[in-house]
């Protein structure tokens, strides 16, 4: 999930709706986003059903199947896509491959 956590209109979301969360499953532990209009970094590592999300260098999700059995509903193969509901969002240096070193 990518979202401007600081926007007033998003202040009453469910925990799993904030930036970096595995949507509807694992909430990001911290709100580490920079202000809208500045670059943020996000690294997502999925190894089987182990999901790790680093936002601006901080580990905010470390979800395993033991803790979140709902991860079993996620496919292990398929397409990677970006979805946008209406706001402008920019991406750069998008890479897909083996996990980066910690």
Please give the residue ranges for each predicted region.
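Carbohydrate-interacting regions of secretory-pathway proteins
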Residues: 1-102
